[in-house]
């Protein structure tokens, strides 16, 4: 059969339908809310070499469409019909990306020949380790993040290896839930195998094998066509997390985007060193690792929404991921909260592409997503644990409309869990679950609003985890005149006299009656807010999205008895335009915290910092980074005049004298 574009689309529809069927099986049979409601899972049809050639379009997380299974496929020596293999070890092939993610794959045989694989991952609520849910930035090494399984067969020729499940059950906090989810994952693979065999029966073995390659080739052509519309050039962007460790320093990711015709290089050189916390990404330095390409996939889809979602999209691009950096950590670094860093790579990539084509891309999404979980007891003293779902914010304002409120691509399209289900899963009382007024960045097109979740706990010993807490300080940037979104807030007992601001804490030990409130950040706005139609501002006020006060101060819209006063609005907007300021890094508006930070830590100084750190052994880098941050802060505190990047080298020379062991370490690095 000749695979022209029409046949490719028909074949793609069959394969995507098979992947969708796998996803539906998992959603309908999983036990934990984080899978059946939030949908933190993936599934795919995979070539014999390990490349995904079909993925669902409507179900599951969207971060894994280019995940390369090759490194783990090769670690199983002999595949037989009925086998299923699994791993959750981030350092065994870099396919599982933190310990709660169990990746499984199943060979599909037809008439004795291995045709392809079906595979996917699920996020388990808990895999043991030092803290409930297995994830916290307080953890510093992988051994603290729960039990790990290197690539191993869990099913051999149709027979389940119960001993592996027994080992897992002895190490996790909710063993029945874990077992139920794994059995659902196995059912998903059985269904995937069935659907693939049906396609083979329809198309034949030869055409099916040809079709796999045709789908990858077609996606590659689509990606090249999109990249070719971006002007050639080198585009630098940086993005920050609030803290690189518990109460730590800001963490920076850097991206040097190089566009050359139909190809692109994503060079992460200049990103922070491997951290003594769990924010590290275990990419193995692969030139096309899915975690480093999430933003790239989203940019492609933003620019052309009919692209095929498979690994062919990645052929025109390669990544540079320096070893021993936060984007390519080496064992035994903790990696549990790699999703915080991955979310930053998403907005980082949009920022770099926006240097080239700001008029075609949205403002920054609300990147401060937190996943809320509760471990508590019921009235009978039984331990219960559940994920309450993601709490973050919306999408950035777009060139043609407002960003979606409360959710979006920045959270991998994870879905919310209904309040009623959360209250049924664990004994808590939801006080509020709503959008946050005035949180979206002002713009011609408003940034998406943040979410607020507030609930009360009742049992002693209750622990609340809020993994990936961020955006308490650094805001989500606006673009082309749009302003930054509001930052996040995390509070215990917010209405009480003893209210406690929790900052970026991700583990809270609660007493009976405590109330926890998390307010997610908002997304950035697109375009000048003074150009927003006054009727749209009025609509936002009536809907509760924008307060009357902020309608006036942000948009220059004056309301009088629930109506727009056009005369006063025009006069106020003229005055505000006369007073508008030029942005220091047009077309971006970063917000006051980042503006102040980059006044001290300029691009030149940060380049000096990362050059120094790259010359050191991995074990020294995080420590020296903090020492240099403290040294520069001390200079400013003393009121000394500090100019240029030379001060960073001067501070490092002082550290070399303070720590004599550092000199030979640097020479041998």
List the predicted regions and their residue ranges.
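Glycine/proline-enriched, intrinsically flexible loops and inter-domain linkers
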Residues: 1-81, 86-110, 114-668
């Amino acid at each position: 059969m000749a695979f022209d574009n029409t046949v490719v689309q028909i074949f793609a529809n069959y394969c995507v339908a098979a992947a969708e069927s796998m996803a539906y099986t998992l959603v309908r049979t999983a036990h934990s809310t984080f899978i059946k409601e939030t949908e933190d899972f993936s599934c795919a049809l995979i070539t014999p070499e390990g490349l995904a050639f079909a993925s669902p379009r409507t179900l599951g997380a969207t971060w894994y469409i280019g995940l390369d299974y090759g490194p783990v496929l090769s670690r199983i020596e002999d595949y037989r019909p009925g086998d299923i293999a699994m791993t959750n070890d981030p350092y065994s092939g870099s396919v599982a990306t933190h310990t709660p993610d169990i990746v499984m794959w199943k060979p599909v045989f037809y008439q004795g020949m291995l045709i392809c694989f079906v595979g996917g991952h699920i996020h388990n609520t808990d895999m043991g380790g030092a803290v409930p849910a297995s994830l916290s930035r307080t953890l510093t090494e992988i051994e603290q993040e729960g039990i790990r399984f290197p690539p191993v067969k869990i099913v051999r020729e149709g027979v389940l290896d119960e001993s592996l499940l027994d080992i897992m059950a002895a190490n996790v906090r909710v063993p029945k839930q874990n077992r139920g989810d794994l059995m659902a994952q196995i059912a998903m693979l059985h269904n995937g195998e069935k659907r693939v065999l049906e396609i083979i029966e329809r198309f034949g073995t030869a055409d099916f094998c040809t079709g796999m390659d045709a789908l990858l080739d077609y996606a590659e052509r689509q990606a090249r066509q999109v990249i070719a519309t971006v002007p050639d050039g080198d585009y630098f962007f940086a993005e920050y997390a609030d803290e690189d460790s518990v109460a730590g320093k800001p963490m920076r990711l850097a991206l040097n985007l190089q566009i050359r015709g139909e190809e692109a290089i994503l060079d992460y050189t200049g990103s922070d060193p491997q951290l003594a916390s769990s924010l590290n990404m275990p990419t193995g330095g692969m030139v096309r690792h899915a975690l480093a390409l999430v933003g790239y996939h989203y940019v492609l889809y933003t620019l052309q929404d009919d692209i095929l979602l498979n690994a062919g999209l990645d052929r025109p691009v390669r990544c540079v991921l320096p070893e021993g950096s936060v984007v390519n950590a080496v064992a035994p670094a903790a990696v549990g909260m790699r999703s915080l860093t991955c979310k930053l790579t998403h907005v980082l990539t949009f920022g770099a592409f926006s240097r080239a084509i700001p008029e075609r891309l949205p403002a920054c999404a609300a990147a401060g997503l937190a996943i809320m979980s509760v471990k508590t007891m019921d009235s009978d003293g039984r331990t219960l644990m559940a994920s309450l779902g993601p709490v973050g914010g919306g999408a950035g304002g777009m060139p043609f409309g407002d960003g979606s409120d409360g959710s979006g691509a920045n959270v991998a399209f994870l879905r919310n869990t209904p309040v009623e289900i959360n209250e049924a899963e664990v004994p808590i009382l939801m006080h509020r679950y709503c959008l946050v007024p005035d949180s979206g960045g002002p713009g011609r097109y408003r940034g998406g609003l943040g979410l607020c979740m507030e609930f009360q706990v009742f049992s002693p010993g209750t622990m609340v985890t809020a993994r990936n807490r961020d955006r308490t300080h650094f805001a989500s940037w606006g673009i082309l005149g749009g302003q930054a979104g509001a930052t996040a807030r995390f509070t215990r007992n917010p209405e009480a006299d003893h209210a406690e601001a929790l900052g970026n804490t991700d583990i809270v030990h609660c007493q009976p009656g405590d109330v926890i409130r998390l307010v997610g950040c908002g997304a950035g706005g697109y375009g000048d807010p003074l150009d927003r139609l006054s009727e749209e501002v009025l609509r936002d006020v009536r809907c509760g999205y924008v307060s009357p006060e902020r309608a006036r101060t942000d948009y220059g819209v004056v309301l009088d008895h629930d109506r727009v006063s056009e005369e006063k609005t025009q006069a106020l907007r003229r005055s505000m335009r006369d007073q508008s300021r030029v942005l220091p890094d047009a077309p971006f508006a970063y917000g006051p915290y980042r503006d102040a930070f980059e006044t001290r830590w300029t691009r030149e100084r940060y380049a000096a910092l990362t050059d120094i750190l790259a010359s050191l052994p991995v074990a020294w880098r995080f420590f020296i980074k903090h020492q240099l941050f403290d040294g520069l802060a001390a200079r400013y505190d003393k009121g000394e005049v500090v100019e240029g990047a030379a001060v960073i080298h001067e501070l490092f020379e002082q550290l070399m004298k303070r720590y004599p062991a550092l000199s030979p370490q640097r020479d041998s690095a």
